[in-house]
Amino acid sequence: MPDFAEPLARLITEFKRLPGIGQKSAQRLAFHVLRAKREDAEHLSQAILDVKDKLGLCAVCNNIADGEICQYCSDSNRDPSVVCVVEEPHNIVGIETTRQFEGRYHVLHGALSPLRGVGPDMLKIKGLVERIGQGEVREVIVATNPNVEGEATAVYLARLLKPLGVKVTRIGMGIPVGSDLEFADEVTISKAMEGRREM
């Protein structure tokens, strides 16, 4: 690796810590910032700080929110009786691009993974059970990723939630096993939502 001036080397190192960014991409990004106007670099750094300082988790569903409640939980046009459970906030983006789901969400912030030491207590499941206990939820659509952890999470949720009197469905296949909802196109996600099956 070539020797870079310390500030540039540090920026490259920080960019490499981002998912999907290797050495060459990190270098390209760092040189872009170096060539950019100071004002543009300040806007970028302020946007990063704002994300950390001004965003939190929705008190209802654990999605990203810039207030106490996210835009989906506060939207009175959405159906509160249908809740789609996803692993991460970015999974909501893929579902929303279909423009077909009109219910609400619940974000687990992960999936069960005994090999990595992630058990049910480490996920945001308690709030989902509490929402169901309030009596408004009729159906829970489990839209965890189609991999081992996602399937294990789906089975666990079905066993936990069915005795509470709600219909538990799993999104249909069409999303390749081992993939992530984030990378699926809107038609595939739309078909998976239409083809959901009861668990």
UniProtKB/Swiss-Prot annotation:
Organism per entry: Solibacter usitatus (strain Ellin6076)
Family under the similarity heading: Belongs to the RecR family.
Chain ranges of zinc fingers (C4-type): 58-73
Domain Toprim positions: 81-176
Keyword field contains Zinc: yes
Molecular function per GO: DNA binding; zinc ion binding
Designated name of the protein: Recombination protein RecR
A biological process term (GO) from this entry: DNA repair
Keyword Transmembrane attached: no
Spans traversing the lipid bilayer: none
Function summary: May play a role in DNA repair. It seems to be involved in an RecBC-independent recombinational process of DNA repair. It may act with RecF and RecO.
InterPro entries: DNA_Rcmb_RecR (IPR000093), Rcmb_RecR (IPR023627), Rcmb_RecR_Znf (IPR015967), TOPRIM_dom (IPR006171), TOPRIM_RecR (IPR034137)
Keywords: DNA damage, DNA recombination, DNA repair, Metal-binding, Zinc, Zinc-finger
Pfam families: RecR_C, RecR_HhH, RecR_ZnF, Toprim_4
